[in-house]
From Swiss-Prot:
Belongs to the influenza viruses nucleoprotein family. This is Nucleoprotein. SUPFAM superfamilies: flu NP-like. It comes from Influenza A virus (strain A/Anas acuta/Primorje/695/1976 H2N3). Homomultimerizes to form the nucleocapsid. May bind host exportin-1/XPO1. Binds to viral genomic RNA. Protein-RNA contacts are mediated by a combination of electrostatic interactions between positively charged residues and the phosphate backbone and planar interactions between aromatic side chains and bases. One of its GO terms (biological process) is symbiont entry into host cell.
Length: 498
């Protein structure tokens, strides 16, 4: 497995730590989420939110966005140098929803970024606690992954909308560090690289001069991140070619798109972490839970436990289905937007439906929406079982390449067959195998053709009862894997627009 040697576990990336043992990792992740919780409690006090208002996920998101904006140095610098009308670069804010006379009202608040930074540092023992900020970014990214489709972005970069399952983390900001890089899908990395190459094609100075040198370093770093996600020698060799190219152009874009397609069967390793809204950590801290002492993990039972005991509310629009809103948030909490619906349904204990069948829009509410008709409901975020989150793509036979599914990137380490339409995927690989990467392309296509949909992934891995915190008795579910289990099936979600 890839975790030996120099690779750090996600928790180490998450907390910026060097190699630590399991107890130290649990403690530092605990310290991170505890800091988020303390910050949230303090913000609720500042804003004079009632207990109910503090548990409203929309308020949580506004508070999270404020602290992310307060620490976004690059944007803050940009705003100060390019003053735009009506935007104070030193302030941040957003909508806070309050309960007044049996109705919800929206209040726009504004705070000094300096003040927010002070409250955040105070909650995190005087440190900047970048890891906690990244954690919030990943929660927002997971929520976007579950809520929006990226068809337009895929088509714009010359990729195929059917590659949507490779797009995890596509809305993460660049500054999300190693922990952010770990959760980005193959398609996300490919898209970032293609955008970069296209700029280089259109702008002669992009790779030149002092700036160009920095650009080049960033390009090679992104190539290495993507290379690290691939699990076969041929895919990695192709990434070396892309990285070493003197001036990257259309040939590299072709190679990258080829690699992205190949990842539908020879899947990359993409990390999954359960990142919860700040209000959930706040509730736990407020009830006296000591995260640092107890320890915490983003990939084990802890987030499931936390959600079993947390009551979070959400605003609901007049024609939305509260159960569907709950499903959306549940998927976001467990980073399960790209997981097979049958696996998610089994773990959750209620049927998880494809996005095309959801009667709900996103969680956030636009400033022009009418508050008069808004209602609020409890989100049902509990689960029947828990399972370990995975970082492998679910390729079988000793983590070499094998069967994948055209629209799934597994989240949970649970045994299943990964059905895929080989014919559909292979159709995309007709033709071009000449050029400098021909032997690698031929090798990749050969591996894909020999992949068998009936191979079992995560052999022997199962889910666990919530009472089984040491994961001693795996329950291996049996699924009817005859049909497509993708969340994006019959998709009609709105596009993600910044």
């Amino acid at each position: 497995m890839a975790s030996q040697g120099t690779k750090r576990s996600y928790e180490q990336m998450e907390t910026g730590g060097e190699r630590q043992n399991a107890t130290e990792i649990r403690a530092s992740v605990g310290r991170m989420v505890g800091g988020i919780g303390r910050f949230y409690i303090q913000m609720c006090t500042e804003l004079k939110l009632s207990d109910y208002e503090g548990r409203l996920i929309q308020n949580s998101i506004t508070i999270e966005r404020m602290v992310l904006s307060a620490f976004d140095e690059r944007r803050n610098k940009y705003l100060e140098e390019h003053p735009s009308a009506g935007k104070d670069p030193k302030k941040t804010g957003g909508p806070i929803y309050r309960r007044r006379d049996g109705k919800w009202i929206r209040e726009l608040i504004l705070y000094d970024k300096e003040e927010i930074r002070r409250i955040w540092r105070q909650a995190n023992n005087g440190e900047d606690a970048t890891a906690g900020l990244t954690h919030l970014m990943i929660w927002h990214s997971n929520l976007n992954d579950a809520t929006y489709q990226r068809t337009r972005a895929l088509v714009r970069t010359g990729m195929d909308p059917r590659m949507c399952s490779l797009m995890q983390g596509s809305t993460l900001p660049r500054r999300s560090g190693a922990a952010g890089a770990a959760v980005k899908g193959v398609g996300t990395m490919v898209m970032e690289l293609i955008r970069m190459i296209k700029r280089g094609i259109n702008d002669r100075n992009f790779w030149r001069g002092e700036n160009g040198r920095r650009t080049r370093i960033a390009y090679e770093r992104m190539c290495n991140i993507l290379k690290g996600k691939f699990q076969t020698a041929a895919q990695r060799a192709m990434m070396d070619q892309v990285r070493e190219s003197r001036n990257p152009g259309n040939a590299e874009i072709e190679d990258l798109i080829f690699l992205a397609r190949s990842a539908l069967i020879l899947r990359g390793s993409v990390a999954h972490k359960s990142c919860l809204p700040a209000c959930v950590y706040g509730l736990a801290v407020a009830s006296g839970y000591d995260f640092e002492r107890e320890g915490y993990s983003l990939v084990g039972i802890d987030p499931f436990r936390l959600l079993q005991n947390s009551q979070v509310f959400s605003l609901i629009r007049p024609n939305e289905n509260p159960a569907h809103k709950s499903q959306l948030v549940w998927m976001a909490c467990h980073s399960a937007a790209f997981e097979d619906l049958r696996v998610s349904s089994f773990i959750r204990g209620t049927r998880v439906v494809p996005r095309g069948q959801l009667s709900t829009r996103g969680v956030q509410i636009a400033s022009n929406e009418n508050m008069e008709t808004m209602d609020s409901r409890t989100l049902e975020l509990r689960s029947r079982y828990w399972a370990i989150r995975t970082r492998s793509g679910g390729n079988t036979n000793q983590q070499r390449a094998s069967a994948g599914q055209i629209s799934v990137q597994p989240t949970f380490s649970v045994q299943r067959k990964l059905p895929f339409e080989r014919a559909t995927i292979m159709a995309a690989f007709t033709g071009n195998t000449e050029g400098r990467t021909s032997d690698m392309r031929t090798e990749i296509i050969r591996m894909m053709e020999s992949a068998r949909p009936e191979d079992v992934s995560f052999q022997g891995r199962g889910v666990f009862e919530l009472s089984d915190e040491k994961a001693t008795n795996p329950i291996v579910p049996s699924f009817d894997m005859s049909n497509e289990g993708s969340y994006f099936f019959g998709d009609n979600a709105e596009e993600y627009d910044n």
